[in-house]
């Protein structure tokens, strides 16, 4: 396999990547990619007199007997090179299914915890061009399968962004997305630095491993070009969706969201994307659903109703209205001092001295709020209010969306598709949507 040279440091990193004077967290597993990143970044920061900001963080998932020894090896290597190092362990029972996804979430949660403790504003990871190509191919294959079923959306084909925001607070930087894995290993060999190969990277039961084995240089170059195009399309679509929001086409009344349909013909694709994004927010879903042929037909026809991703979408001549489907709405007990996310829509903290129960309101409780006046007569919408979050404490029930938040409790709406990770190219859309969903009670 041929490799490309590693670009000059000023191409990989820029001063804007590391503004401020806080710590810079680098995720280092002990593999070749992350170790090469660590030493490349150390070189760059040394050239700017900022090497002391660098902190390597190793997450020990505890999934292999060798993991603790490997983490200790990274710590020793960092000590020899004057790099501050921390090891964090994934504690608790490991799931029997969906292990890779849960491990990934746990890894980023621990990295964010380290960043919080260190006062860092940025987390840097060593994803490479090979990783990017593999991600693109996997998503392309899934999207093609979905297209066959009339559900493809293509949104994920932009693959991994160089810059994103993680957990609403930390900048996630991937500076090596243009660099081949082989080039990084050559760099380490030239510096006489060894690395550890994870045996999971050769497990044929892994989708990524199977894709990796099929990729040659030409396929990787082709995937790289396709990602650039897909990213441009996604960024452009996000800007158009943000413009639609900023034109006052979206408003929230209680628990029902309204989108104006008139005059969107020239931006139909962006409007469809906005509807799907809002459906994910209303339904409390992390993934934005594809605009299927059935949904698109409904939006074009201007008359009908469909449920998508836990959200009811009602289309009329002049508007699209969305509210949460009355289904799978859990009751949650929140002890004093605890916090939780309810239904993927609300982040709630109980700072009071009494337990709080989170649930949907009973029919009689809703009527009491309106003094027995039907909600529709007040301009509000009964079906959507039946899915709102009611807070019950010491026998008293409060509906924050209508009555305000009781003392000792904090509550905020969540824009779930943007809550854990948002690409830099979609931050304009997030900025446009946040005022719409800001909690005004």
Per-segment meaning from a language model:
Residues 17-23, 29-30, 90, 164-169, ...:
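AMP-forming adenylation/ATP pyrophosphatase catalytic core
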Residues 40-44, 87-93, 123-124, 170-172, ...:
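Bulky hydrophobic/aromatic packing residues
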Residues 63-68, 202-205, 303:
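Acidic, metal-coordinating catalytic cores used for nucleic-acid/nucleotide bond scission
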């Amino acid at each position: 396999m041929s490799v490309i040279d590693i670009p000059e440091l000023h191409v990989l990193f820029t001063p804007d990547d590391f503004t401020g004077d806080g710590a810079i967290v680098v995720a280092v597993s002990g593999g070749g990619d992350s170790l090469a990143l660590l030493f490349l970044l150390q070189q760059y920061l040394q050239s700017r007199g900022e090497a002391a900001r660098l902190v390597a963080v190793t997450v020990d998932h505890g999934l292999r007997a060798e993991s603790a020894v490997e983490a200790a090896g990274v710590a020793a290597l960092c000590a020899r090179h004057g790099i501050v190092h921390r090891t964090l362990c994934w504690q608790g029972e490991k799931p029997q299914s969906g292990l890779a996804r849960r491990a990934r979430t746990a890894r980023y949660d621990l990295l964010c915890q380290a960043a919080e403790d260190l006062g860092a504003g940025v987390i840097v990871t060593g994803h490479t061009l090979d990783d990017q190509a593999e991600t693109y191919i996997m998503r392309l294959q899934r999207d093609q399968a979905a297209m066959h079923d009339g559900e493809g959306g293509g949104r994920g084909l932009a693959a991994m962004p160089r810059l994103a925001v993680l957990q609403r607070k930390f900048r996630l930087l991937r500076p090596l997305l243009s660099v081949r894995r082989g080039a990084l290993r050559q760099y380490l060999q030239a510096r006489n630095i060894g690395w550890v190969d994870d045996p999971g990277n050769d497990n044929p039961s892994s989708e990524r491993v199977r894709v990796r084995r099929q990729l040659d240089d030409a396929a990787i170059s082709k995937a790289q070009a396709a990602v650039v195009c897909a990213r441009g399309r996604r960024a452009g679509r996000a800007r158009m969706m943000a413009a639609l929001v900023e034109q006052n086409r979206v408003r929230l009344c209680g628990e029902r969201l309204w989108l104006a349909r008139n005059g969107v013909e020239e931006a139909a694709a962006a409007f469809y994307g906005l509807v799907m994004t809002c459906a994910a927010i209303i339904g409390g879903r992390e993934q934005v659903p594809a605009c299927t042929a059935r949904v698109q037909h409904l939006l074009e026809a201007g008359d009908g109703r469909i449920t998508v991703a836990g959200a009811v979408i009602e289309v009329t001549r002049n508007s699209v209205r969305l509210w949460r489907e009355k289904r799978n709405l859990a009751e949650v007990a929140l002890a004093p001092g605890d916090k939780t996310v309810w239904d993927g829509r609300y982040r709630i903290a109980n700072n009071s001295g009494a337990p709080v129960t989170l649930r949907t309101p009973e029919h009689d409780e809703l009527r009491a709020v309106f003094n027995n006046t039907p909600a529709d007569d007040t301009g509000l919408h009964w079906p959507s209010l039946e899915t709102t979050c009611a807070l019950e404490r010491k026998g008293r029930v409060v509906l924050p969306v209508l009555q305000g938040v009781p003392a000792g409790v904090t509550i905020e709406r969540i824009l779930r598709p943007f809550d854990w990770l948002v690409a830099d190219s979609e931050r304009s859309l997030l900025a446009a949507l946040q005022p719409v969903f800001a909690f005004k009670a």
